[in-house]
Amino acid sequence: MKSITVIIPVYNEVESLKELHKELTAVLSGNDNYELLFIDDGSSDGSINTLNELSNSDYHTKVIQFYRNYGKAAALAEGFKVSSRDYVVTMDADLQNPPEEIHKIVASFEEGHDVI
């Protein structure tokens, strides 16, 4: 399987981060070549502390911190800039999109689609 980056912009999502991380790692457990790239967009609710805990306990998890809120577009742009994997998937931190959809997205990439 090709390598995957999942970019997750975060703004004051401390309540959902551990569950999101748990679900993402479960979904991606069959592929050791992935990274979870959380971009903290100036959160003020302690999200960065939770993200740092997750990063310290899981080498697949990377964190970038913005010191003020620049917006989702800036967070995504930064994620795309630093990603080094074959496929890039974006996901909201609030679990609005089920992490299980990642496999469908990757399958579409493997069929030759550039944007899903």
Features from the language model and the residues they span:
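Structured catalytic core of nucleotide-sugar glycosyltransferases
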Residues: 1-116
